[in-house]
């Protein structure tokens, strides 16, 4: 199968396979099998076939040359595309086998399987929301996900200016749990560890 067969087949009803449908199929990875040696990567294919959708084969060839520098989607873009379009977080793109083996070796559970005696878990931050307390101190609400696909919130207290949390990267953390407030953590610098 080729891009030409998909785009210019007389048997396909193109009002059904419109630009939006093609966009979702390409960015979710469903059409990876159509990317051949003419394309420098998935982003190049997406730009040439979807963004500037050709009506004729000649225009497709022009697009292939025009968008050649696009290359491939970054890892961050691929994670965002798969998570947003399929609703499933691509843990395989974030957590490599070495890190996964180490977590299992040290018996560190995902946050959904929190153990109050151990108080150490791993997760992947998806979003950081910055807030202020009544007294004006900054704290963060971090939305996280783990291998069980459970999304959870962690409140980070005592945030300092130099503290950083990378989105879509695995972390191990010492956290507390309260029935009323849920998960919380103090001192990102001391209690959070970036894995891999």
Predicted region positions:
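Sliding clamp-binding short linear motifs
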Residues: 1-116, 155, 181-196
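Conserved, well-structured core segments
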Residues: 87, 121, 143
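Structural detector for short beta-strands of small beta-barrel domains
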Residues: 116-134
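Hydrophobic core residues within well-ordered beta-strands of beta-rich domains
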Residues: 119-121, 140, 171
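Flexible glycine-rich surface loops and low-complexity tracts that mediate binding to linear polymers
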Residues: 123, 166-190
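Acidic surface patches and DE-rich sequence motifs
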Residues: 131-135, 146, 178
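Short acidic/glycine-enriched loop/turn segments that link adjacent beta-strands
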Residues: 136-138, 182
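Beta-strand/loop nucleic-acid-binding surfaces
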Residues: 139-143, 147-166
């Amino acid at each position: 199968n080729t891009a030409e067969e998909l785009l210019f087949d007389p048997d396909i009803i193109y009002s059904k396979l419109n630009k939006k449908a093609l966009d979702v199929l390409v960015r979710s990875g469903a059409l990876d099998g159509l990317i051949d040696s003419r394309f420098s990567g998935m982003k190049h294919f997406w730009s040439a076939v979807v963004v500037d959708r050709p009506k004729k084969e000649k225009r497709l060839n022009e697009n292939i040359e025009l968008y050649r520098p696009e290359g491939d989607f970054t890892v961050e873009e691929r994670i965002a595309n798969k998570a947003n379009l399929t609703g499933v977080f691509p843990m395989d793109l974030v957590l490599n086998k070495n890190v996964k083996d180490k977590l299992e070796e040290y018996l560190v559970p995902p946050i959904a399987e929190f153990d109050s005696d151990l108080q150490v878990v791993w997760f992947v931050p998806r979003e950081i929301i910055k807030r202020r307390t009544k007294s004006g101190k900054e704290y963060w609400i971090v939305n996280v996900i783990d291998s069980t696909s459970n999304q959870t919130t962690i409140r980070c207290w005592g945030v300092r200016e130099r503290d950083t949390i990378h989105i879509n990267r695995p972390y191990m953390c010492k956290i507390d749990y309260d029935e009323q407030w849920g998960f919380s953590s103090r001192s990102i610098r001391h209690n959070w560890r970036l894995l891999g």
